């Protein structure tokens, strides 16, 4: 079973949204497991102190290396599990990483707070820093939920159809094509005729063209990478 362990100072935040919809139903069905642990339980003093002032001065507080290391050691049960630290300075999370994580045993995720985490525990416990975007939140809990939700929906049996995630944004390097449903007319805007034609080949070609156009317009970085791997087909005969 895919299992994720979350280390946090606010365990009451979980499962939160992960207890609803696809992830929630899958959790109840036993398709994945969530282990949430309070970092404060690893504090040594009676005040359950987990942070201290930054060496060299500066604002805020820093999560202590000794406390977090103890929490990681107490929670870890497999050396093969990825150890992640949700951090705005981490490498951007991508769909390919999500696919890889969902295919493994499930990660241990550290949710940071304060000004950050003592660098020594990041190095000593091999924490891979992961970011969900170029912005700063109050803590790592919401990013951790986003990562877990993205992984869980790819687990076997979670989505209704195996192909449900096949054409989603990023699955093939492109953003997803526009979607439509009834009514056929909405405020003078019709569903494109091609989608009602019943010609599956033409529908597929339309969707591919729309996905390419959207990606090129909205995510030139993705488009450049995709176009480099998918050069235009030559019309000349060999």
Swiss-Prot record:
It is an enzyme of class 2 (transferase). InterPro entries: Alpha/beta_knot_MTases, tRNA_m1G_MeTrfase_C_sf, tRNA_m1G_MeTrfase_TrmD, tRNA_m1G_MTases_N, tRNA_MeTrfase_TRMD/TRM10. One of its GO terms (biological process) is tRNA N1-guanine methylation. SUPFAM superfamilies: alpha/beta knot. S-adenosyl-L-methionine binds at residues 132-137. The keyword Iron-sulfur does not apply. Transmembrane segments: none annotated. Keywords: Cytoplasm, Methyltransferase, S-adenosyl-L-methionine, Transferase, tRNA processing. It catalyses: guanosine(37) in tRNA + S-adenosyl-L-methionine = N(1)-methylguanosine(37) in tRNA + S-adenosyl-L-homocysteine + H(+). GO terms for molecular function: tRNA (guanine(37)-N1)-methyltransferase activity. Pfam families: tRNA_m1G_MT (PF01746). It is found in: Cytoplasm. GO terms for cellular component: cytosol. Disulfide bonds: none annotated. Gene3D superfamilies: 3.40.1280.10, tRNA(m1g37)methyltransferase, domain 2. Its EC number is 2.1.1.228. Specifically methylates guanosine-37 in various tRNAs. PANTHER family: TRNA (GUANINE-N(1)-)-METHYLTRANSFERASE. Belongs to the RNA methyltransferase TrmD family. Homodimer. This is tRNA (guanine-N(1)-)-methyltransferase. The lineage of its organism: Bacteria, Pseudomonadati, Pseudomonadota, Alphaproteobacteria, Hyphomicrobiales. The gene is trmD.
